[in-house]
């Protein structure tokens, strides 16, 4: 799992204080409970925010992470000025030898309300 610190949304909007569901330590502990092999926390700063989406795919996803499977939500954006999206990742699947997986959003029904999470939740069985 690749995660960023600070979260890009918080980096670009300094007025956001309570955007997180969990802090970084809690997030890592939750991922460990899901038996994630490793968690990479990348410092998100001005230089990293300037990386073009194609360079992110080539240099981060392919060369550094050597990713074979990439789990993303439909609204996932990346790269300088959020230029990259899921369509672009799919476009490069064959060239860089990875597979995009878009799990269905989690929908929780509670009394008198509906909670919709467009985040990625999966089990080990789903990635085998």
PLM feature segments, named:
Residues 1-128:
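Nucleotidyltransferase catalytic core that binds NTPs
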